[in-house]
Swiss-Prot record:
<keyword id="KW-0378">Hydrolase</keyword>
<comment type="similarity">
    <text>Belongs to the XseA family.</text>
</comment>
<dbReference type="GO" id="GO:0008855">
    <property type="term" value="F:exodeoxyribonuclease VII activity"/>
</dbReference>
<comment type="subunit">
    <text>Heterooligomer composed of large and small subunits.</text>
</comment>
<dbReference type="InterPro" id="IPR003753">
    <property type="entry name" value="Exonuc_VII_L"/>
</dbReference>
<dbReference type="InterPro" id="IPR025824">
    <property type="entry name" value="OB-fold_nuc-bd_dom"/>
</dbReference>
<dbReference type="Pfam" id="PF02601">
    <property type="entry name" value="Exonuc_VII_L"/>
</dbReference>
<protein>
    <recommendedName>
        <fullName>Exodeoxyribonuclease 7 large subunit</fullName>
        <ecNumber>3.1.11.6</ecNumber>
    </recommendedName>
</protein>
<dbReference type="Pfam" id="PF13742">
    <property type="entry name" value="tRNA_anti_2"/>
</dbReference>
<dbReference type="GO" id="GO:0005737">
    <property type="term" value="C:cytoplasm"/>
</dbReference>
<dbReference type="InterPro" id="IPR020579">
    <property type="entry name" value="Exonuc_VII_lsu_C"/>
</dbReference>
<dbReference type="GO" id="GO:0009318">
    <property type="term" value="C:exodeoxyribonuclease VII complex"/>
</dbReference>
<comment type="function">
    <text>Bidirectionally degrades single-stranded DNA into large acid-insoluble oligonucleotides, which are then degraded further into small acid-soluble oligonucleotides.</text>
</comment>
<dbReference type="GO" id="GO:0006308">
    <property type="term" value="P:DNA catabolic process"/>
</dbReference>
<keyword id="KW-0963">Cytoplasm</keyword>
<keyword id="KW-0269">Exonuclease</keyword>
<dbReference type="GO" id="GO:0003676">
    <property type="term" value="F:nucleic acid binding"/>
</dbReference>
Length: 456
């Protein structure tokens, strides 16, 4: 039996149009976070890229009138947050995202602020080596600016007590995390300079995320460190954590414990150095006395050996020895020269060059033939690949669509016209053809009523 009502039959164009309308009307604008990849910017100024996460990706476009409001240059691998409309490109049936706005997501925004401040302060020469103050050697009093409850303070005090128990330490407690932390750190630095009790300051905290360490990327903290008359050692986080404070400080220590090592004297090491110096001095004195005694003995012996009869006897013996060596060397030289002449004569007779020349010429001819064959084959393959690539590029080029007689019309706001209700009489329109643009004014609007076929 036939069903009472046949299912609706869609053309491909109608199907794509229906899906596009469903996406645009049902979804509306959405916020999407993801990682940028395959970013390109053709001559039109539009941006084309892919947003992806661990399991999926979607193609995106951001037109020139929208991307000119973005305050940063998107980079491959950057995490971003976009506000976009979901649509379908009807000619190809491709689902894509039209991005209206973009901003860095999460730590990407913090990293961007970090780089901007770093570039700004570097341009003002706050990082230059010429402004770095030398640390006192030795330090007579150490100031520590950090949290009074943090592990960093415990580590610093532990190292100072172990290395230099007599070194005075003054603690300027401050918050190192949160919105109020930068202001407190600045006030602590200024207070230390006003009281002028210390000759070196340690400013830092323990490790954490980029957000946790952000107080030490604050411009106010950086300028306070730069303005400090007392030398500042930065000790923020772990060795891999680098903050703006590290660049401005007079010295950067990889950890708070390392900062304490830098500013303190190791008393045990000093004692070992004194003992070592004493031992070296004693050894030097012993060596000097032994050397003087040995020198005196040598001079005394040389005086005894310089008798004229002894000198004549030694010279006579040496002359006879040299005569024997000269005769023996001359005989050996003549013998070796004769043997060498015989070997050269034999080698010359054996090394007739004609056979070798013939073999080399034959080999060269074979290689020339093989090289010509390889070059012809590679040239043919390259021409074939180039032809295929040109054909493929021409097939997928958007300009090919325009060349077949199609055009794209946009309103004054840059939106592509799809229906007559998007325009009004008197508005100016821009039409893109294969070879250029046409600006026109709407004189008359005539909607076309679509006829519906009754389905039996």
């Amino acid at each position: 039996m036939l069903p009472s009502q046949s299912p609706a039959i869609f053309t491909v164009s109608r199907l794509n149009q229906t899906v596009r309308l469903l996406l645009e009307h049902e979804m509306g604008q959405v916020w999407i976070s993801g990682e940028i990849s395959n970013f390109t910017q053709p001559a039109s100024g539009h941006w084309y890229f892919t947003l992806k996460d661990d399991t999926a990706q979607v193609r995106c476009a951001m037109f020139r009138n929208s991307n000119r409001r973005v305050t940063f240059r998107p980079q491959h691998g950057q995490q971003v947050l976009v506000r976009a409309n979901i649509t379908l490109y009807e000619p190809r049936g491709d689902y894509q995202i039209i991005v209206e706005s973009m901003q860095p997501a999460g730590e990407g925004l913090l990293q961007q602020k970090y780089e901007q401040l770093k570039a700004k302060l570097q341009a003002e020469c706050l990082f230059d080596q010429q402004y770095k103050k030398p640390l006192p050697s030795p330090a007579h009093c150490v100031g520590v600016i950090t949290s009074k409850t943090g592990a960093a303070l415990h580590d610093i005090l532990h190292v100072l007590k172990r290395r230099d128990p007599s070194l005075p330490v003054i603690i300027y407690p401050t918050s190192v995390q949160g919105d109020d932390a930068p202001g407190q750190i600045v006030r602590a630095i200024e207070l230390a300079n006003q009281r002028n009790e210390c000759d070196v300051l340690i400013v830092g905290r323990g490790g954490g995320s980029l957000e946790d360490l952000w107080s030490f990327n604050d411009e106010r903290v950086a300028r306070a460190i730069f303005a400090s008359r007392i030398p500042v050692v930065s000790a923020v986080g772990h060795e891999t954590d680098v903050t703006i404070a590290d660049f401005v400080a007079d010295l950067r220590a990889p950890t708070p414990s390392a900062a304490a090592e830098v500013v303190s004297r190791n008393q045990q090491e000093l004692l070992r150095q004194v003992q070592s110096a004493r031992q070296r001095l004693e050894m030097a004195m012993d060596y000097y006395l032994a050397n003087r005694t040995r020198r005196f003995t040598q001079i005394h012996h040389r005086l005894q050996q310089q008798h004229p009869q002894l000198r004549l006897a030694r010279q006579q013996t040496m002359l006879e020895r040299l005569q024997k060596r000269m005769s023996f060397a001359l005989e050996n030289q003549l013998k070796r020269a004769g043997q060498q002449q015989q070997r050269l004569t034999q080698r010359l007779n054996q090394q007739n060059p004609q056979p070798k020349i013939h073999r080399t010429q034959t080999r060269i001819q074979q290689l020339e033939y093989r090289l010509a064959e390889i070059l012809r084959a590679q040239l043919s393959a390259t021409r074939e690949r180039f032809g295929n690539a040109v054909t493929h590029l021409e097939a997928v080029s958007p300009l090919s669509t325009l060349a077949r007689g199609y055009s794209v019309t946009t309103a004054t706001d840059g939106n592509v016209l799809k229906k007559v209700k998007q325009v009004k009489t008197g508005e100016m329109l821009t039409t893109r053809l294969e070879d250029g643009w046409i600006e026109s004014e709407v004189k008359n609007i005539q909607p076309v009523k679509k006829s519906r076929k009754k389905v039996h």
